[in-house]
Amino acid sequence: MRKTKIVCTIGPASESIEMLTKLMESGMNVARLNFSHGDFEEHGARIKNIREASKKLGKNVGILLDTKGPEIRTHTMENGGIELETGKELIISMDEVVGTTDKISVTYEGLVHDVEQGSTILLDDGLIGLEVLDVDAAKREIKTKVLNNGTLKNKKGVNVPGVSVNLPGITEKDARDIVFGIEQGVDFIAPSFIRRSTDVLEIRELLEEHNAQDIQIIPKIENQEGVDNIDAILEVSDGLMVARGDLGVEIPAEEVPLVQKELIKKCNALGKPVITATQMLDSMQRNPRPTRAEASDVANAIFDGTDAIMLSGETAAGSYPVEAVQTMHNIASRSEEALNYKEILSKRRDQVGMTITDAIGQSVAHTAINLNAAAIVTPTESGHTARMIAKYRPQAPIVAVTVNDSISRKLALVSGVFAESGQNASSTDEMLEDAVQKSLNSGIVKHGDLIVITAGTVGESGTTNLMKVHTVGDIIAKGQGIGRKSAYGPVVVAQNAKEAEQKMTDGAVLVTKSTDRDMIASLEKASALITEEGGLTSHAAVVGLSLGIPVIVGLENATSILTDGQDITVDASRGAVYQGRASVL
């Protein structure tokens, strides 16, 4: 079962209900809407289709609104484009003009105050470089020298590496888009070009004004200033997106992999989800198969510890959107098989602080690995418990049971967490019982599996203080167990020694009213023994201990309840008999 989550950008190639259904079936967990393009009508229709497709499949698919952000762009060019030549001077004006080979203008009037002689200005995603020769604040102009030939077309992006620009945290357009997202009930906001913690707080204030504090903020780190201020940004954020496109323009390309690793590591330590984004399977916009480098890129992001991997143009406008998701699913699934979960847990343990929830999270992850648990099941009010366990990357899947569908969708971004809808409970026992049942319904857990359950106080979030090891199964009978062993096998019901001798086979579970010395030969073949007669000093108890097999005595009507050939598991430590094979300690 794949733990890494897949984020897909929805666009013209993927906006239909039919295509969205295929993407979800192929592995999409979160749908991203890029508000750099499209209007409210388009995005509203896409949100409606996403909800309809997810309802049809019964899946909790999150919706992420990606803002355009406070970017700098050029204005229009003469004849739609100009040819810039190496060594020629080019004036950048703060007043809008139609661009020529002598002068162009930009959308950000404050640029003249932010750059200085020697600064570098990059145009069109870094394809054309300019060196600042002089700044004339009075004329509102920047004199530059063109560093390489290139064609500059209308409204291209402008980057200023190493310069702290005084753009606002969010633009008026961003604010309108976010309010629209609130009205539509999106789950995540991914603000672009976040440079400092105050940028995030501006957005949080806007969410609070509209009573939408539950929407999570996943800032996109796309420049050096954002990298430098990462600790403060993370403190006020719910996660992070490593947006390698603009980041690779703002900082040297050779630094991007190192920054990616560092940002992922910081998110992992805090238990906050991190998305690795941009050009992951870029060639699949045109080709049905990825390059080997792209496959390695996806795998290495998973080895770094990313929670989610993102597709952009591949699913928004590419020719092979479904194949791209399937490819990402296959690479992620195979990469996860190669992870050393014990080593990851050991490293994470040394990287984080210690709260009660952290202590429980660590213990749960350790216990699940040591007992080879089939799953970790956690009833959760806010999703916090599930996230705190997920940060230790246990090998077992985490089934988070919550009554809140919004929390289920937000957990769609967290590695290894699979959310299920639960019911309100009035007591801890009721809550745990419901969680076990929902984990069975999910298909992740089946009867006989050993699971680790963790939870807190009913109705209170952030109070995780309980851990329980539990065998999921139909307990069909209980008596008094002798010893701590367990065994699995077919039942042989015998009323006396002669019948036992005739029917017993190696590895069968002998079920009888009582035993005596005439049954010793049959007992030596048995994997376990169950008697109706009770008593810790009974013949069955003493012989069972001497033979080293699990024994349950005092099980009322055992010879009537159990039938010949019935496969059961005998758990002496609990005195329980399970239907079928059960994973017991």
Swiss-Prot record:
Q: Per its UniProt record, what SUPFAM superfamilies does this chain match?
A: Phosphoenolpyruvate/pyruvate domain, Phosphohistidine domain, PK beta-barrel domain-like, PK C-terminal domain-like
User: Please, which domain of life does this record's source organism belong to?
Assistant: Bacteria
Where are the membrane-spanning stretches? none
Q: Note whether Cell membrane occurs among the keywords.
A: no
**Which GO MF term does the entry hold, naming one?**
magnesium ion binding
Which keywords belong to this entry?
Answer: ATP-binding, Glycolysis, Kinase, Magnesium, Metal-binding, Nucleotide-binding, Potassium, Pyruvate, Transferase
- What InterPro entries does the record point to? PEP-util_enz_mobile_dom, Phosphohistidine_dom_sf, Pyr_Knase, Pyrv/PenolPyrv_kinase-like_dom, Pyrv_kinase-like_dom_sf, Pyrv_Knase-like_insert_dom_sf, Pyrv_Knase_AS, Pyrv_Knase_brl
What are the binding positions for substrate in this chain?
R32, G245, D246, T278
Q: Give binding positions for ATP.
A: N34, F35, S36, H37, R73, K156
Residues noted as binding Mg(2+) in the record, renumbered to the chain: E222, D246
- What pathway is this protein said to act in by its record? Carbohydrate degradation; glycolysis; pyruvate from D-glyceraldehyde 3-phosphate: step 5/5
One of this protein's Pfam families, by short name? PEP-utilizers
Record-level GO cellular component terms: cytoplasm; cytosol
- Quaternary structure note: Homotetramer.
Q: Which family does it belong to?
A: Belongs to the pyruvate kinase family.
The identity of this protein, by name, is Pyruvate kinase
Q: Which organism is it from?
A: Bacillus subtilis (strain 168)
Q: What is the lineage of its organism?
A: Bacteria, Bacillati, Bacillota, Bacilli, Bacillales
